[in-house]
UniProtKB/Swiss-Prot annotation:
The gene is hisI. Residues 1-128 are annotated as: Phosphoribosyl-AMP cyclohydrolase. InterPro entries: His_synth_HisIE, HisE, PRA-CH, PRib-ATP_PPHydrolase-like, PRib_AMP_CycHydrolase_dom, PRib_AMP_CycHydrolase_sf. Residues 129-222 are annotated as: Phosphoribosyl-ATP pyrophosphohydrolase. SUPFAM superfamilies: all-alpha NTP pyrophosphatases, HisI-like. HAMAP family: HisE, HisI, HisIE. It catalyses: 1-(5-phospho-beta-D-ribosyl)-ATP + H2O = 1-(5-phospho-beta-D-ribosyl)-5'-AMP + diphosphate + H(+); 1-(5-phospho-beta-D-ribosyl)-5'-AMP + H2O = 1-(5-phospho-beta-D-ribosyl)-5-[(5-phospho-beta-D-ribosylamino)methylideneamino]imidazole-4-carboxamide. This is Histidine biosynthesis bifunctional protein HisIE. It is found in: Cytoplasm. It comes from Parasynechococcus marenigrum (strain WH8102).
Length: 222
């Protein structure tokens, strides 16, 4: 990330306790991982060290996230909202666990009964491509009768790669026809079948995101 001047902190509006809420967001898929509090000292420590430091209201002390568990958060970018009273940190979560329950995100509840981070914990909302890949992985690991995705996976490379070739040709034709709706639809078809191929070969969508981020040369979402 680009170095920030001390004036950055001076722009912020802290509450009467000298604190400001901070949202931690995954730097690749945009998933919201947690919310914590920061003060001037923790912000400065975060900027100096490159790892997220928060302020613990219960312990009344500086809190280096992951110092004990090993689940540290590498800072990728930091910004504040239009009122300068909320921070947004994009971070790289070590171990892919942000919550003390062991869940990836603290925002895993959404049902009538609490899951407490167990097997019923919800995955954090993310971008459409990440959500799609989750469904494909779920079909791979827990096949459903009549599922088109499972039919592709059962057919292996021959069936999957044939479909990628067919959809690629249709995408080319849509581009030649200069039809925006068809172009978008065919692009979506290619992406879906490509993700099925990735899942079939045990390659995660996140690996693809990491390659794209590295090629871009900037630790921010596109």
């Amino acid at each position: 990330m680009q170095p920030l001047s001390p004036a950055f902190i001076d722009q912020l509006r802290f509450n009467e306790a000298g604190l400001i809420p901070a949202i931690a967001q995954d730097w690749l898929d945009g998933a919201v991982l947690m919310v914590a509090w920061m003060n001037r000292e923790s912000i400065q420590q975060t900027l100096n060290s490159g790892e997220a430091h928060y302020w613990s209201r219960s312990r009344q002390e500086l809190w280096h996230k992951g110092a004990t568990s090993g689940h540290t958060q590498t800072l990728r970018s930091i910004r504040y909202d239009c009122d300068a009273d909320v921070l947004l940190l994009t971070i790289e979560q070590r171990g892919d666990i942000a919550c003390h329950t062991g869940a990836r995100s603290c925002f895993y509840e959404g049902g009538d009964q609490r899951s407490d981070g167990g097997s019923n914990a919800l995955s954090p909302p993310a971008d459409a491509c990440t959500e799609l890949f989750r469904v494909i992985e779920s079909r791979r690991d827990n096949p459903e009768e009549g599922s088109y995705t499972n039919k592709l996976l059962e057919g292996g490379d021959n069936k999957i790669l044939k479909k990628i070739g067919e959809e690629s040709a249709e995408f080319v034709m849509a581009c030649k026809d200069d039809n925006p709706e068809e172009i978008a639809g065919e692009a979506a078809d290619i992406l879906f079948h490509m993700q099925v191929a990735l899942a079939h070969h045990g390659v995660s969508w996140r690996q693809v995101q990491e390659v794209l981020a590295a090629r871009r040369g900037a630790p921010r979402r596109h």
